[in-house]
């Protein structure tokens, strides 16, 4: 590297500064002499290299003189350039402002000097200096005037700035005043615990002050700060915060339910009693004696319970009518079709279904025989009766399905299924709270029960009558053949 001009050596003028800096690099050359004689000399580097061909390349790239010649920008005589210059003026003797100095600020020594704190920091110091950590606006004014005499003679606009910071800054929040306090008009202001660390960091960036030493360390425990700054904050209280916002009671229910889903069971045991149970906040009986929590029912449970009796009385088309007993709402109208046989008949084989249907059809056979005793006496013989029993045992589900279709039960069953779906859809679209409070119409359910029972009863009677007529026709035909033989 080439020679460097020492910092102690200062040029007398801008022109001399530039020429002397370049002369140190090119000693004894014609270029240094030309700098002193003619100021209009061309400073092109190709000409310099032609004149000094034997000079080393390192001296050509030496630009240390630019750092030493600090008066280059001042030679233009423009104050704006001096203000935006990146080069620091080491000879400037103007006293620095307190905000940019490392010296501590003292309001007693400089009462007319503006404090280097923002209004949010002033409000923060005023509130933290109070024993209750809460102050009205007028007490904040008095604290600032007491500790910073500058604002006594300052324009009155600083009070508006304090009020604007209180209302617009998220770090401060308004709290309700107690009845025992007599502060007059206005509200109490306190520090939001969530933004307290932000204010402490902002206060640390300002010069040291005797009032800021208490804010450098956070409180010993969050409970100690909450006991002085406001009511306790836990997941079930009305002041519970989520993402920096105060939640009201409806929001607390949803937020606490989501917290319960994301919280391990061992942590859930530490929640206060009555906060979260089954995904909903349970109200305390002592605080609200007339309020009782509603039980949590899954979606669609109310509609399922409402339509449970109707759906259980419906029979699908795949089930044979001869094997499934007719269900009636009244035990007296059961006609020997008990509901206990329904589960047993569906779990057994089709052969057992036919046996049960034959025994059931025998009851109707006896009733019809009593009416036809005078006209057809030949059906009382033991031979014809045994043959009809064997035919009943050979019945198949396909014949039963045909009998069911003849009775018109299939069309009625489809209509009833469509009606049940139409009733189920609006109830499922209702909100959960309305679904809890909504009661199913009992009159409609009773009508549907009676209609379903009567239709099933008529379908069973008609299918049985068809079987009886078929058996009687077969018996007559066989009897005629036997008489002819």
UniProtKB/Swiss-Prot annotation:
Taxonomic lineage of the native organism: Eukaryota, Metazoa, Chordata, Craniata, Vertebrata
InterPro entries xrefs: FH_FOXN3, Fork_head_dom, FOXN2/3-like, TF_fork_head_CS_1, TF_fork_head_CS_2, WH-like_DNA-bd_sf, WH_DNA-bd_sf
GO CC annotation: nucleus
Subcellular location: Nucleus
Compositional bias (Basic residues): 412-424
Name of the protein in its database record: Forkhead box protein N3
Low complexity composition bias: residue spans: 338-359
Species: Sus scrofa
Database matches in Gene3D superfamilies: Winged helix-like DNA-binding domain superfamily/Winged helix DNA-binding domain
Name of a matching Pfam family: Forkhead
Keywords: Cell cycle, DNA-binding, Nucleus, Phosphoprotein, Repressor, Transcription, Transcription regulation
